[in-house]
Design a protein with these regions (language model features):
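Catalytic-domain carbohydrate-binding cleft regions of carbohydrate-active enzymes
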Residues: 1-213
Length: 213
């Protein structure tokens, strides 16, 4: 289940209870971007990129994710990585230190997907801690262009590549969820069908549409 809606822990779990009551089977819970802080000071960007839980909505993330696991569901979080890491994020200082950014000035850690060092810290400091809390995989919702500082290197392609490899680092079968990145991009992720209507007719059409994207 995934919906672009500002769920809380309580409202999301109540919805899962209602699905169970109606005998509607769901095996994956994907939380859209409101899991993280979005209403941030404009000096920190748009709020679309984020890695810090919104504790007003999810006061105990490990408890919430465990509750979904206890229901037999896998879990994923939505991310828009383009704006990097800004000074309001809880892991900003350690990320800035690792990347040689002046954290005392609050300089942003820019997203540079062509930099192997950034890729390393991106996973180590932004994603692995969330996975330790119970996140199983990620929804890569890149919408910010198709170029990097390396000619021909598409940012969504490289994100799909590295997220797939990183998700399998413990020996499990890798899993990642992503937008369409051009011909052949089904090599790595399960494809995101795009925004849809919540109707049975739409659900019936989506497997055909996604398989032919």
């Amino acid at each position: 289940w995934s919906r672009f809606y500002a769920y809380t822990e309580e409202s999301y779990l109540a919805l899962m209870d209602e699905f169970q009551r109606r005998q509607l089977p769901f095996t994956v819970g994907i939380i859209d971007m409101d899991w993280h802080l979005v209403d941030v000071d404009p000096k920190y960007g748009s709020g679309w990129t984020g890695y810090t839980w919104n504790r007003e909505y999810f006061p105990d993330p490990p408890r919430f994710l465990k509750n979904l696991h206890d229901r037999g569901m896998h879990t994923a979080l939505n991310i828009h990585p383009a704006e990097g890491v800004k000074a309001h994020e809880e892991m900003y200082v350690e990320m800035a230190k690792a990347m040689g950014v002046d954290y005392e000035k609050g300089d942003p850690v820019n997203c540079d997907l062509a930099d192997p060092k950034y890729i390393q810290e991106y996973f180590c400091r932004l994603h692995h801690p969330r996975e330790e809390e119970g996140v199983d995989f990620w929804w890569i919702d890149w919408q910010q262009g198709g170029s990097t500082k390396v000619e021909g290197l598409d940012p969504l392609w490289i994100l799909n590549h590295y997220h797939f490899l990183d998700n399998g680092r413990t020996g499990k079968r890798p899993m990642t969820f992503s937008r369409y990145a051009g011909p052949g991009s089904h090599r790595y992720p399960v494809g995101f069908s795009g925004d849809t209507l919540i109707t049975w007719e739409s659900l019936d059409f989506q497997p055909y549409f996604t398989a032919n994207a």
